[in-house]
Amino acid sequence: MSQRGLEALLRPKSIAVIGASMKPNRAGYLMMRNLLAGGFNGPVLPVTPAWKAVLGVLAWPDIASLPFTPDLAVLCTNASRNLALLEELGEKGCKTCIILSAPASQHEDLRACALRHNMRLLGPNSLGLLAPWQGLNASFSPVPIKRGKLAFISQSAAVSNTILDWAQQRKMGFSYFIALGDSLDIDVDELLDYLARDSKTSAILLYLEQLSDARRFVSAARSASRNKPILVIKSGRSPAAQRLLNTTAGMDPAWDAAIQRAGLLRVQDTHELFSAVETLSHMRPLRGDRLMIISNGAAPAALALDALWSRNGKLATLSEETCQKLRDALPGHVAISNPLDLRDDASSEHYIKTLDILLHSQDFDALMVIHSPSAAAPATESAQVLIEAVKHHPRSKYVSLLTNWCGEHSSQEARRLFSEAGLPTYRTPEGTITAFMHMVEYRRNQKQLRETPALPSNLTSNTAEAHLLLQQAIAEGATSLDTHEVQPILQAYGMNTLPTRIASDSTEAVHIAEQIGYPVALKLRSPDIPHKSEVQGVMLYLRTANEVQQAANAIFDRVKMAWPQARVHGLLVQSMANRAGAQELRVVVEHDPVFGPLIMLGEGGVEWRPEDQAVVALPPLNMNLARYLVIQGIKSKKIRARSALRPLDVAGLSQLLVQVSNLIVDCPEIQRLDIHPLLASGSEFTALDVTLDISPFEGDNESRLAVRPYPHQLEEWVELKNGERCLFRPILPEDEPQLQQFISRVTKEDLYYRYFSEINEFTHEDLANMTQIDYDREMAFVAVRRIDQTEEILGVTRAISDPDNIDAEFAVLVRSDLKGLGLGRRLMEKLITYTRDHGLQRLNGITMPNNRGMVALARKLGFNVDIQLEEGIVGLTLNLAQREES
């Protein structure tokens, strides 16, 4: 997430073209031509011994002879010279370099050279970059691009050229257009951090094929998407496509889970990609999800309705007042409804009257205008009239407008006019609905991610016991555990299992059945037979000793006949669950090569295909995230909403998924977990059959996860001056109600000192931003007092680090009636220790000169205090490295 050098790449003050040429079609010629034609304001320095000047610009024979050090260099020479030239640029002090081509054999040497000289690299095999607001075209793009508010980051030069060509025809602009190439150094997460703060960028579109660091990507994407919509198209969904692209991209459902967890939206194909570009370039942010449709034909409106229905969209309902105004304005044969079919004889005037009435109403959030070729309302004329009406209507800025001028030849000019006017326009009704639903789903994802999670009830975990059991199994050489062996591990995390024992033969099976009680089930134990059903290896509802003995012998006999070489480790004898009216589910944890552990929920089957049969989420899960997974499974028909007798207990299943998540997060030894079946019967969820694959684990437990989990190890009990003990711990999303209550007990004066303004009330969004933090980028510690199973917050301190993890901004707030207990100092000491251990160099903050308590505390803690009376602030800076030495 480093931002080092990105300013020199994306806003360079000078550029050197190494290998500049006067020969057309040479890379050095094309790069010089594009840089000069783009209108770059700074010096462009062609470097070539072959020419005195290139395109009228004085050339320099080599890098050493350059009159000053360029911010950015572009290597346009033969790839064999890359390493030597990069070394020269590094010695010259160049900050960034674009490498247009390099074989894989050079990658490690190029990376090492750049690191040695503190230089950043874009590429290799990069098309380059375009930054129209800087007049920068450091690319091979054959077409120029206009200024716009959309940033595009691509890992494919071919896709980049396609989008550029399409955008030129639509006269569509970009803030940045960056082709990453092989991402040897600069990667997508760093660019997301940069673009999130860029004032010229209002939306971001990504084309991705692979990731080098899933954790950094999810963290950066989650941060950026809180302020700007980000859409992703990901290729390589099939194994064949991954082989073609030569990538190890991981499981496609894992990408869906990561994209959703980060608050992004995925588009599935090139058609959706073009619609997404149109939408992000021109469409206003949605206020809600209610859509109003007007058309001059029933059939196009019906196609739009079908597309809306298939994506679970929502039609607006018109008020009676709006309906009456439309009846008064339109011919009597027009039925007032939504969609509003103006009929094929509708004139441009009918469109404008309808538009005016609808824009004055508040019955919808987005308006879709469909126009089919018509003699009564020619396409171009209707578009011109509509554009003027929208331009001058006082309420047009409050509504998201989408236009769909059907047809090709007759509507081409109309679509050009809409693009020039900044109104999103699409070729088909279905494409328009797709674009609308992109923004609805993005808005919905963001809203869901900010909801306050419920506190799960009776959530227990015994991490130490689970670790001990796993370590014992590994020490004994086990690599896979079955239901009997996994039972105590699941129970340590509060999950229900049935009494299960191992029998070596039919006689022992009868003995165990007598002990645990009838009816029982018998299940084959064999590592060589993946599906017990292949040999009828599961026998249910055995009610007598005779039935148990016969069933056991029959299982052994079938194995000998069908799988004579199979190893048999006896039978599992298990109490028979009451399956009447119950529902069978499957919960699987797989390890993805890119995103780490994945939690999958479905109904299973012999042939388990997660992409078709399961919904997927990244751990860690809280109750909200688990609930979304369950609801997603129901909506996508991966699981049923009810069994024959009763509905599925969504809250109960969500809690079980949280328990599974906690187990996986706490126990890195677990490689795979398969609970199948999981029996859902009312509020009871029971694991009937479980397989657990394990292996030794060394290293950082958290590093294997794509999302950093809650850091339990930072919890600490602290005794205050009055002898009271309170818990210092990282903040949780579930803390929102307690945080709101805490703020209500802070005086207005103290809040003013903290926020530099009078704040009457914090919104849910404000509180969500304070509690739902990314522990990789931010840390907030709360001091908590526990009273009768409830918690109240006494104080909060937080630090937000920059993307380079060098500086962090800090703040501290203590309940006004609890000052003098040393709470603020203890919280600050904990924050200082954490930020220093986290590798930060400086801790910065500001307060007001009359906040004497904070100024005095800062001095005691070793901060440099800079009182700026003219500005009315006090700057506070702590050098963490110096403090550690002292």
State where each predicted segment sits:
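Long, contiguous binding/interaction regions
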Residues: 697-886
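Short beta-strand element of the conserved SAM-dependent methyltransferase core
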Residues: 522, 573, 692, 783, ...
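Catalytic-core regions of core metabolic enzymes
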Residues: 1-689, 697
